Every structure is written in structure tokens, then in C-alpha cells.
Amino acid sequence: MSVRLRFLSQGDAGAVGTVGRSASFAGFSSAQSRRLSKSINRNSVRSRLPAKSSKAYRTLRKGSLCLDPRPQQVKKIFDALKRGLREHLCEQQAELDYLCGRHTDTQRGSRLAFYYDLDKQLRLVERHIRKVEFHISKVDELYEAYCIQWRLRDGASNMQRAFSNSTQSRASRESLQELGRSLQECLEDMCLIEGTLEGHLGEFQVKMKGLVGYARLCPGDQYEVLMRLGRQRWRLKGRIEPDDSQTWDEEERVFVPTVHENLEIKVTELRGLSSMVVGAVTCDVADFFMARPQLVVVDITELGTIKLQLELLWNPLDSECRLVSPSPTGRFSMGSRKGSLYTWTPPSTPSFRDKYYLSLLQQPVQQSLLLGGPKATSILGYLSDSELQGPRLRSRSQELLEMDSFSSEDPRDTETSTSASTSDVGFLPVPVGSAACTEEETREGPPPLGLLPGLAHPARGVLVERPGWRDLGGERLALLQDAPIHSPMVPRSRKGQEDGDVGDGVEGPVQEVLDLLRSADPAQPQLRELEYQVLGLRERLKPRGVQPEPVSAQSLMDCILESFAFLNADLASDELSLFGGSQAPERDSPPPPRPSLKVSPSELTAGAPELDTLLTVHLQVCKALLQKLASPNLSRMVEDCLLEEAVQQRQVLEVLSDLDLEQVSKARSVEEIIPQASHRKGGLALWQGCTQPGGVLACPASTLLSQLKKTFLHRVRGKYPGQLEIVCRRLLEQVVGCGGLLVPAGLQEEQVVTWFQFHSYLQRQSISDLEKHLAQLTKEVTLIEELSCAGPAKALRKLHGKCLSQLQPLPQTLQAWALLQLDGPPRLCRAARTRLASAARNKRFREKALLYYTNALNDSDAKVQQAACVALQQLGGIESCEQIVSLCQSDLEAVRVAAREATLSFGEKGRLAFEKMDKLHSEQEAFCQEADVEITIF
């Protein structure tokens, strides 16, 4: 479907602004609207005149710098930008090859003017290619500098965590303050590089191509389209004419892309004195960096009944204006953002490291300490003595601090000062001095006093991370995962754990839950509270206590200094000297030995092994809940149940985060940790038989299964032989699966069950006597087998003889019951439907049945889908009307018929939903037949 457009001139702009009554709801246009359309048609000649597109640059203003860098977003934009620049370069190269071929075939004497024009065009393309290549090199340089600051920030964060976990002293507090300032400088540099990168993103030229809506667009309708990209806005109004053409007051606008903002589009229908929002969508700008023009068709409504057509052209080289990025005073001048882009060089290392390396060179001869040993070089020792070294070093450090700036007013001054700073400092990877002397001092002297606290004690360990070990392309920044630094030994409650056989840390489940929460609906307060709880839990995680082997002072210092060795990657060997001092070690020399530790640096702990197990189990439950919440076509009822369970899991995590570690490791019963557990006497007695002192809050599923069979053996085996194993497994599946809300893939023997899961099941089922509950569960399991395997006559007697509303019911019961409505004689099917309708009078039974059958609508088995539709029809499950309607377009006739009958049985609401789906299906078929519309869905 082609859309005819007319764009008004400046004199006609007020015509569209006159708002009449919407024809979509009040018929076609009135006399006033017809007069308006005629006046627009008379001025259509002027409307076709090309007008200079207005740019949105005037909306950019200088603002405050947001110290919140987003490395993953920058990486995403950088990859898209590089891909687009390469495509643009390939197209220009292809054009250059074509022009070179024509230039070679053309004789210089023939058509001299044509030859000169071709030669001029050839030189123009060559110049443009050089600009693009230089542009790509500057983008690479910017991102390389950004990665350096990224790694420096991680290193500073890890060192800050190391000092915060060490013994508190005056020196450590001073080091923390200095590290905080260094970390702040890294954050500022990252944000400034992000702002500079925005100057290399080019511009987007957006052209309005009109609305596509078929039945939704009527003559006389007026719409307002608002596009927003950061602080840039484009608001334009349009009108649907009687000849199906569209008139808009503006044709195109230029947007400047940003790193952190996406393109937001909102369409509003103007109705006289009021307006109605048709829909709003968000488009990722990373998809727009393409060399060729794109025809973008965006679904404004959820069902795609109204679409917005845009033509988008990306210009990678924008030289008409200069942008102003938000920056603090003294970093960038107002007009120097684009002017200083191509003279920018990576910033020097923060002054904290400059002063530290200078102090290594200017230290006097090694002095003896109280014990007669040499004074080891350390960060803490340097920070504690930095105020006592005299004005000379203080003035030199002040000069370095002044030189350590990201940019200055003059770009050339910036380059000079930065290069001078680099050559003076040198960024030595190891301390300059005699290696033999250092080894002799380390071998003969006693343990140094100036090292990081905890090295003199064998029960504590320090692990300093090398930046090269971190994966910069990961999904998240591993501020904690890659740097376990100093944690006291944790008492182990199990023999296997005492031997060093520990499980994985809880960092992985925590991050998985946080990733799912960040992609979830932000309007859900339950999920936001859960996110805050998990974030607080992550902050409390500590590196697992390790037993390090004895390490030498020189080995540790070399490992610390090697963390910043990547800064010397591009320096020549003669540039590594400093003030005429001795040279640094050669590159081909072997690296210093890393301190030997026995634990993987990625293992984080909550302080006790049992707490780690509990947190892992409940975080996995949260992960399963969030994954189910993110599934499409989810009913409101199921969503409410999932959110309610998420609230309970948040409460469990809150209780776990407040537990006393010593009390947990020494407790002999659950009551000592959770006094409220005494209210469940029957369940508590069973649980205590499954646990041991020091591990009373969790037990393996196999242990709980054995205890259940041992406790209720006399009750089940005599009356229901062969059912004990099945009954106990069904009970455990309900405990692990949150009462049927989550369907477990099968009970694994190595699976862990927590007291909180067991207590939640007892509370959900209102169980006061566990023995009676198990007897009732045994009857239900027996009923399942009889309904599935018995003949029609026996199954019919069972249906009439049981009080079905008193069942739990189990998922297996509901499935067997639903299938009875399809298979077997008509009399049995009618009886199954009648009994299901009567059992629905019980509120608890109906809720569980609705929950199960609504989930069964998404089953891969078509027969289960058909049975679920029939069951929901008997239950009057109008809450699941939208999910049932979606099956009306199934490929199988039986499923379509069952879904149609169930939908129409819901009365007026079901009829409207069915008509809406049928109309949508017809529109989609008509839309697929149109071959001249290109659609890009975001």
C-alpha cells in the first residue's frame, strides 16, 4: 500500500493545527473539514516546494556530567558504528572502482569537459574515503582509550575492596581515600570519552512517510507524532484527506544520536478538545547505523493495526555543526567538542599511580626497621609516608595532578602535555632497582612489616587480580567476581567441605537473577523490591576464605605492579627509562610468579557453606519465576500468582541475609534459628530427622524422601500397596515446584530442599497433621491411576463416588480429568464435564485448576491444548479468555473448534474477544497480500 503525502508550507502550517472531530468514532468529515481539505488542496503547489530541513541541534545544551558510565552500552554502540562505517567504506570503494574503470576507458582528448568532471569526481570520492578511514581510526582510538579507563576503574575498585577488607588503620583509611579519588577520576574520564564518542556518531536524517492503518485510518482523522531522541524532539501533525492522501506540516528532521538514549515514538489521535494516545514504541539506535537508506515501518499498536512509515538515512560524517557535550568546567570548552576530536589523545594515568611510581624511584637507600629487616615497598607504606617526604615530591606530584587532565582549551596544548606526562613518568611495570639485591633482602630478612595486612598470618590470603584475566566483552562488569581479596576462614560443617570440596559460589545465580530483573517490567513493585533485596545480598557476599601458600614480598609486589603493565604495551624499550635511571626488565623475560592460591577467584560466599546452599536454591527459584513471567501470552491470573510467589522468595532472602553465621553453624534444630518453626510440630519432627547439627536449614531431596517413606511406611503400605514411592515423590514435587506453580523437570536425587520450601508447602496447604495429609494425597494418587488405566465403567463410578473438590488437586489429577472429557464413551465425557463444573464451586480448587489449565494452553501436545480448552469452558475461566482466543488460529481443526466454543461460552466478553481476533486475522491476511510495503519490526 503506497501512501500519498503532502507537506504544508510555512503559511499553511496552521491548517493542520485546527483540530476537528475524529472520524474514526463519529463518522466521516463534516463540512468544516471539507472546506479545510479544499484549502489545503489549493495550496498543494507550495507544499511540494523543497524546504531546508530543520535540525534538532538547538535542543542540546550544556548540562551536568552524569558519573554513571555504561561500558556494555558503549560496546554495543561501538560495534554498530564500526559495522556501519565499514559498510559505508565498502560502498565508497565500490564507487571508486567504478569511476576508475570509466576514467581508464575515457580518452583524454575526447569530451574534455566530461573527462575533467570525471577526474574531479574521482578525487572527491578518494578524499571522502580518506576521511572515513581517518574517522574509523579515531573511533578505534577512542574505544581503546575507553577500555583502558574501564580496566583502570576495575583495578581501582578491586584495590579499594582489598583495603576495605583489611585491618583498619590510619594508613588503610588514607589509601581508601586516595583510591576513591582515583576511581572518581576514572569514572570522569570514561564519561568524557563517552561524550566524545557521541561526536563521531554522525547524524540521522528522518523523513516522514505517513501512517499505515487500513481500517483504522479514516478521512478527517488528525494525528500528532512525537519523536524524541534524548533532548531532541520532533513534533508534527498530520491529517487524513478524503482521497486517502495525508498532509503533514513537516517533511524531515535531522537527529544527532547519543550513546545512552534510544528513539522514542508516540502517536496521538487528536479528537476535538481531547486526545487519545494510540501507542508508543522505542527503537534502538544501534540498528540505524547502516550505509544505505532504510524504510522503517514501526508497529505503533500492539496488534499492528496502525504503523508509522519512516525513511532513515545515516550520515557518518557531519561537518555542518558542532555539538556541545555535558562536561564539567575546565574539561571541555563550549565550542571545542567537534574541534578537538581529531587532536585528542588518550588521557594519562591517574595521578595516584604517577605519584606511586615516582616514589619508587626517589626512595632513599633501604633503611632498617625495628627487626633489622629491609623496608619493603608497598602501597600502604607509600601512602602512610607520602606526607613526610618533603616539598620536592609534593610539588612534583602536584604538577602531575595538573597534567592529568582529559582535555584542555587548546587541543595542541592537550596533546603536548599528555605526551610529556607519558614520557616523564614512563609507567614502569615493576619497581626500578637491583633484582639481585631484592632477592637477597627477601631471602635473608624476616617477613616485611609494610605489606598489605594479613600476609604475616597464614590463615588469611590476598589475591591481586591482573587486568588481563578479565573478559571485557562480557555481559557485566565483574567487580567482585574477579577479585577475591582477604576473607577470614569459614568454619565448615561437613566433612567434605573441610577437605576443600566446596560448591560453586553464589555470584552466578545472583547475576542471573539481576539480569532477568533488569529486563523485566519496571512497573511491577514486587520485582523492584526483589531487585533491591538481591542487590543488597550481592553487596554482602565476600570472597571465600582461602589458605595461601607463603609468598615473598617481591613476588606480591611484582604481581601488584603487573596489573598496570598493559599501559606499556606500545612503549619502546628506550622510553621505559625515567630520569636517566635504570631500565625496566625486557619484555621477553618471564613474568613474576603469581602467588599460589588453592581456590578459584570466582567463588564468593555469604559466610557459611549452608547459607551458600540456601541462597543458591532460592535464587534458582527466583530465576524460574522470572523466566516464566517473561514468557509471552501470560494471563493476568498466572502473573499475579508468580508475583505473589516472588514476594515470598524476597522475604526468604531477607531472612537469610539477616541470619547470624555463628548461630547457623552451631544450631542443632531449626527452632534455634527460626523460632516461628515451632508452630509446625508435625513437619518439624519430620524435618529434624533429615538434618544434622550445623546444617539444619537444608537437606538433600533423597534424604527427605527416605525419611518420608520411613515415617509413613505403616500407614500407606498396608492399605495401598505399591503407592508409597509415588506418593512421597508427588509430595516432594509439590514442595520443590511451589505448589504446582512451577513444573519441575523431575525430582533429582542431588537436589536440595530447604526448610523454607517445606514450610511454605505446609502453610499453603494448611496442614496441621502431616499424616492425614499424606493419607489424602495417597487417595488422590490412587484416583489418578484408576482414571487413567481403569475401564470406562469403573472410571465413571469413581467420578460419582469421590468428593473431587476436596482434592489438592495435583497436576496429574487435572490432566487425567481433562483427558476424560475427550476420550471414551459420551456418557463418561459428560460425567467428567459435569463433575468438573460442580467441583469448581470450591474456590481453592478452581484457582489451582485455572492455573494449571491456563498453563496447559501453551503445551506442545495438541490434545492437551484441546482438553484444557474444554476444561476451562466447564470452569467458566473467563480470566483466561485472551489465551484461549489465541488458539482460535491453531493449525489443528480440533483445537480451533474447542477454543472457539470455549470463547463463545464466556458471554459478551468472549464474543468481543473472538470478533477482535477474527478481525485481526483478516487484516493480517490482507496485509500479507500487499507486496509493495516493506516492514521492519523492532
From Swiss-Prot:
Question: Family, per the entry?
Answer: Belongs to the RIPOR family.
Q: Does the keyword Transmembrane apply?
A: no
List the InterPro entries.
Answer: ARM-like, ARM-type_fold, FAM65_N, RIPOR3
For region Disordered, the annotated ranges are 402-430, 579-603
PTM-bearing positions, type Phosphothreonine: 345
Q: Give the originating organism.
A: Mus musculus
> Which Pfam families does UniProt cross-reference here?
PL48
Q: Please report the name of this protein according to its UniProt entry.
A: RIPOR family member 3
The residue stretches assigned to a coiled coil in this entry are none
Phosphoserine-modified residues are 9, 24, 340, 351, 384
Q: Does the keyword Ligase apply?
A: no
Which PANTHER family does the record cross-reference, listed alphabetically?
PROTEIN KINASE PKN/PRK1, EFFECTOR, RIPOR FAMILY MEMBER 3
The UniProt keyword set, sorted, is: Phosphoprotein
